[in-house]
Every structure is written in structure tokens, then in C-alpha cells.
Amino acid sequence: MQKPELLIFANIAAITYEEPKTAKTKFKAIGCTIVEFFDIDNAQAYLLKNNDGIHILSFRGTEVTEPSDILADLKAGKNIEAIGGKIHVGFKGEINKLWPAIEKAVSDINSLYVTGHSLGAAMATIASGRMQSKVLALVTFGSPRVGNKEYVNSLTVKHYRVQNNCDDVTKVPFLLMGFKHHGTHMYMNYYGAFRNLTAWQQIKDMVRSRVKAYTKGQKFLGAYDHMMDNYIAKLGKFGEE
């Protein structure tokens, strides 16, 4: 999947943070209509259909003003998931709030894309695992680690996992806690170009990026890089592949 396609999903993930009235207008501007809005105990998602009749399920990420979102992020224990392995307790709790309604809404849909940012990326990953036969692709931005090795190996969905340079959320929960990442890792460097780097090369690249950012007055690059607007800005640089 190339930057123009990823940018579409990035915009959808960003608009998902909006309330329905505002979201409706913004989704329409990019060729999507709202099929259903899910909102249960501050867990939220939109089921959309674009002008080509393709369905997209998008999950809202962490709202720093919502205590339930923060608590979900902090509950780092693991629970068994049906497809195999164990997943983050807090993320599972959030998707479970919406799952009965989502399962019903997609029951007659044969195929769809799934996306989300931050907590929404984790929820999107778990949801995709529960309906793997329907998912054309999972596209996530700034995703934390969701489950253990067994769980990750149980996921067969095509997953484009986009990381913006020093995004701190992509580094938690920690590897030492038994959590693993899933999917094709799409790492964007400081300039917005995708780079296929080893783990050690990526660490060196991020150190260089933090030094560059600090000289420009950006002291919290890890938080800055996690912002959805900054994913969109870098994905908009089509010429820097």
C-alpha cells in the first residue's frame, strides 16, 4: 500500500475523533458516508461506506480528556483471546464494549477495511482478528503492541502498521512484558520517507531525529510524532518514497 492510499485511511482515522455532526461533513468531503456510529461508554467507532461501495470500520483513539481511555491504556495485563494467545486487558475491555453492536452491523457485509490510531489502532487490530475472513486489510497508525507472540501468530489479516519516526506509543506495552507487534511495519523517518531498517538502524535513526528536533525546539518528539495530524502531514509528502 502506497502513501496516497495510506493517506486516505489516515484522514478517516483522524475524522473518527470528531462527533457525528462534524464527522458527517468531513467524511462526505472525502467520499464517505456514515452507515453507523457506535458509542458505548466512551468507546467509539464509525462504520462507513465510500463512493465505490467499500465499507471501512474506523475506531477512535485515546482522548486525553476521557478517564476511561486513559485507564484502558494503563491496564497492561493480558487476557485470553478466542483466536489464540493473549491480549492487553485494557484494549480488550474497550473493544468488548462495542463488539456486539459491531458484529451485528457487519453480519451482512462480506468484506471491509479496518483502521484506527493509537488506542483505536489496538481496537482495530482486535476487531480484525475476530472477523479475519471479512477483512481486506487492516491499516493502523501509531499502534501500541496488542498481544503476545501466540496471539500475533494467530492473526492472518493483511496489516499495514504505520509508525511515524519517534512515536512513543508504538513502544508500549514493553517487549519485556511479553507483548509483540503484528503486521508489516511501515516506518517513516524524520522527513516522512518510508525506510526499511533493522531494529538497530531504526534506533540510530530515531536518536538522530531527536537531536534534530531538539535543535529546532521540539523537546517532546515522541508525543509530537504520535499526533494524527503529523502522520497526515508526512503521508502528504508523496515525492519522498
Residue ranges and their predicted role:
Residues 1-115, 119-241:
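Non-catalytic, mobile gating and regulatory segments of ester bond hydrolases
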